[in-house]
Each structure stands twice: as structure tokens, then as C-alpha cells.
């Protein structure tokens, strides 16, 4: 039995459970303290003035709470949230329809905003700055521009690849924040809260074990908690004990550092198939049978954070730590392993 922690499609039941455990207020949001403290000030000031909150850009790896924070911003500002994603906005008309439907104080959340087509993105510029959009009616000699008013709103954009944002779009966000991975102690706090909402107890040692293998990511921690609940209930237990947590994690093949099957396939390919690198991400994607974007957005950030992988101008390179752990002892690596030089 195997799972891909971040790339597994989420069905309707999972989405409902995720929504159930999602914090609704800023004070219930755990972690990212500096970010949330600043947002509290910005939101309070905007409400005192009766203005829409400045547009907010949230960047960072998947599963750290960007979508949750967008919901909280809408709740704190007293507006409605309309959510979409960059790939869905493939036509300017789709974006225009959404923008003109917004009421004063509403929040428009665009996930994966870096994947929005450039032609559509340009329609956002005047909407963000002047709360208006210009659309073209007809074509050829009879074409004419029509200006439509947009109610003051807040755009919350989320991205896992902030470097792919165009400079004009990035410059229009008045508030920009980056999410960091969570330390285990904060993930424990999240797990204790989530277990209460899900109606099952969890021992502190069990929460600690799950937190330590959750890759610093609340979404993964909560998914593992739900799987541990499954094991506990099938075994007739009313509380998740440490042995139950260990049984769950072992069954899902998640090691002590939170690496899953795909992480290990990636590192095995870099270390053994490509002799430690450098290797291009396209070749790596073909080697492990995964999408290039998924490797770059989902797996690489944590492997780099964990000290196993480095990005260089020539490609991905295994660190000395990775060589020592993942090498199958091939002759091509022996000199690298013991020459005292680390790829950086």
C-alpha cells in the first residue's frame, strides 16, 4: 500500500474533511507568526478606513496554508470569497465575468496564479489598480473598447513558483508573504486540534511521531492523521497510540524523515542512474515517470530543505549526504563518496 503525499487526487470526502478542520479565524491559524501578525494589522487598518485590503501574494510550497489563509482574510474582511486557479482562467472573458460579479470587499482567490496566461493576466492590471477593466467588443473595423467598473476587492494570489510571476503582476501586490515549512512542535499542535475536530483522541507521542514525518507540512500531517484514525478504528481503538501511528506510517512506507516512495525514486535516479548529477529536471522526470512541474513544485523543495538535493546552473546534483544514504555502491560513485567533496 503506497500513497503520494502531495500529488494524490483528493476526492469529495477528503475535501469535505479538509474544509471541516480548516481554521476560520486568524487566532486559530497555527504558525507563520510574523506573517499573520502583520496581516492582522493590515486587515484592522483596512477595516477602520472602510477600504478593501491591499492585494496579497502568498508564496511557498504546497500544503502550508495559503488557501486557508485566503479564506480567513475573506472572513476577517467580512466579504465573500470566490476561488479559481490560474489554469482555469484560460480566456479573458472568464476573468471578466468573475471580476464584474464581485461585490465591494469580496476576496478573489487565484491559486497557481503563476500559470495564468499572459493575455488574461493583463486584464488584471487595471482591475487591481483602478478597479475597472477594458474589454473589446467585436473585431476588425467595428471593434470598440468598453470600460466596465469593478467593485473594490482584494486579490489573493497563491503560488508555489514565485519566480515565474511577471514583474508587472508582482509589482501590483501591496502585501507579499512567503510561507515556511513548519517545525514539528507546531505540527503537533495542529494534529491535536484536528484530532479533536475529527472526534478521536491522540497520544502526544503519537502526534509527535506523525509530525516528525510530515515534511513540515500541515496538509500532510492532517492526511496522515486521518489514515492513523482509520487504522485505530479498524483495530477497535478509541485513541491513536504511538504503536498505531508507527503501524500507519510503516504501512504507508513513510520513513523517519517523511520521505515517501517518489522521493526515494527521485534520489535513487539522481544518485545511481545519473551518477550523482548534474541531471536536467526533464531527464529526471522521464526517469521516474513523473511530471516535470510536479517534481519542481512538490518534491524538490523538501529534498533541498532536507539536504539531499542541490540545484545548480547545470542541473540537479546529489549532496554528499544523499550519496552516503542512497548510493547502491556503483563504481561510478566511489570516488565521489569518499573524496570529501560535496556537490553544491
From Swiss-Prot:
This is Holliday junction branch migration complex subunit RuvB. Its main location: cytoplasm. Its EC number is 3.6.4.-. Signal peptide: none annotated. SUPFAM superfamilies: P-loop containing nucleoside triphosphate hydrolases, Winged helix' DNA-binding domain. It catalyses: ATP + H2O = ADP + phosphate + H(+). CDD domains: AAA. Residues 256-344 are annotated as: Head domain (RuvB-H). Residues 1-182 are annotated as: Large ATPase domain (RuvB-L). Homohexamer. Forms an RuvA(8)-RuvB(12)-Holliday junction (HJ) complex. HJ DNA is sandwiched between 2 RuvA tetramers; dsDNA enters through RuvA and exits via RuvB. An RuvB hexamer assembles on each DNA strand where it exits the tetramer. Each RuvB hexamer is contacted by two RuvA subunits (via domain III) on 2 adjacent RuvB subunits; this complex drives branch migration. In the full resolvosome a probable DNA-RuvA(4)-RuvB(12)-RuvC(2) complex forms which resolves the HJ. ATP binds at residues 21-22, 63, 66-68, 129-131, 172, 182, 219. The RuvA-RuvB-RuvC complex processes Holliday junction (HJ) DNA during genetic recombination and DNA repair, while the RuvA-RuvB complex plays an important role in the rescue of blocked DNA replication forks via replication fork reversal (RFR). RuvA specifically binds to HJ cruciform DNA, conferring on it an open structure. The RuvB hexamer acts as an ATP-dependent pump, pulling dsDNA into and through the RuvAB complex. RuvB forms 2 homohexamers on either side of HJ DNA bound by 1 or 2 RuvA tetramers; 4 subunits per hexamer contact DNA at a time.
Amino acid at each position: 500500500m503506497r500513497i503520494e503525499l502531495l500529488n494524490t487526487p483528493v476526492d469529495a470526502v477528503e475535501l469535505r474533511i479538509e474544509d471541516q478542520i480548516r481554521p476560520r479565524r486568524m487566532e486559530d491559524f497555527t504558525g507563520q507568526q510574523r506573517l499573520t501578525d502583520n496581516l492582522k494589522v493590515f486587515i484592522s487598518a483596512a477595516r477602520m478606513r472602510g477600504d478593501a485590503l491591499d492585494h496579497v501574494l502568498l508564496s511557498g510550497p504546497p500544503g502550508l496554508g495559503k488557501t486557508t489563509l485566503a479564506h480567513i482574510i475573506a472572513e476577517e474582511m467580512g466579504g465573500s470569497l470566490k476561488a479559481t486557479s490560474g489554469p482555469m482562467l484560460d480566456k479573458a472573458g472568464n476573468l471578466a465575468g468573475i471580476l464584474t460579479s464581485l461585490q465591494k470587499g469580496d476576496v478573489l482567490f487565484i491559486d497557481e496564479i503563476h500559470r495564468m496566461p499572459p493575455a488574461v493576466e493583463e486584464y488584471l492590471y487595471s482591475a487591481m489598480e483602478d478597479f475597472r477593466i477594458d474589454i473589446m467588443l467585436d473585431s476588425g473595423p467595428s471593434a470598440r473598447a468598453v470600460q466596465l467598473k469593478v467593485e473594490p476587492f482584494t486579490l489573493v494570489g497563491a503560488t508555489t513558483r514565485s519566480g515565474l510571476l511577471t514583474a508587472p503582476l508582482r509589482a501590483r501586490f501591496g502585501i507579499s508573504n512567503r510561507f515556511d515549512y513548519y517545525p514539528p512542535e507546531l505540527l503537533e499542535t495542529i494534529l491535536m486540534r484536528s484530532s479533536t475536530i475529527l472526534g478521536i483522541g491522540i497520544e502526544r507521542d503519537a502526534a509527535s511521531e506523525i509530525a516528525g514525518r510530515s515534511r513540515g507540512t500541515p496538509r500532510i500531517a492532517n492526511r496522515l492523521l486521518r489514515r492513523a484514525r482509520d487504522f485505530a478504528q479498524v483495530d477497535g481503538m478509541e485513541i491513536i497510540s504511538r504503536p498505531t501511528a508507527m503501524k500507519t506510517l510503516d504501512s504507508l512506507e513513510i520513513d523517519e524523515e517523511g520521505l515517501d516512495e517518489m522521493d526515494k525514486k527521485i534520489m535513487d535516479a539522481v544518485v545511481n542512474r545519473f551518477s550523482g548529477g548534474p541531471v536536467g529536471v526533464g531527464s529526471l522526470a522521464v526517469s521516474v515517470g513523473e511530471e516535470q512541474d510536479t517534481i519542481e513544485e512538490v518534491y524538490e523543495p523538501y529534498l533541498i530543505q532536507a539536504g539531499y538535493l542541490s540545484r545548480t546552473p547545470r542541473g540537479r546534483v546529489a549532496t554528499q549526504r544523499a550519496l552516503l544514504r542512497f548510493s547502491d555502491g556503483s563504481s561510478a560513485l566511489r570516488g565521489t563518496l569518499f573524496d570529501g567533496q560535496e556537490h553544491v
